[in-house]
Amino acid sequence: MGQIRVPRKGVTPSELANVLSRRLGGGFEVAADDGTVIVRRSPLSAAVVRIRNAPGATVFRVRGAGVPLVSLGTSRAVADALRKSPEFRGV
């Protein structure tokens, strides 16, 4: 799905998981792991978000996991939620 760069440094996986849980709603299962957040819509559809720090920003890399066509919708929903999230606009 691509990369989303937000102008906020030091976003943690647990913080990202909390924001995605609120933004995506009850139809998604969100779990944080070491530097990665996994978002599942169904057993066949998931998105993996990796967190990378950049100078003055945080970069989220969103990729689909599972059945390709089904995962595309999940990864797109995650990427849209990240882009529209006011929590990551800056401190």
Language model segments and positions:
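Intrinsically disordered, low-complexity regulatory segments enriched in Ser/Thr/Pro
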Residues: 48-73
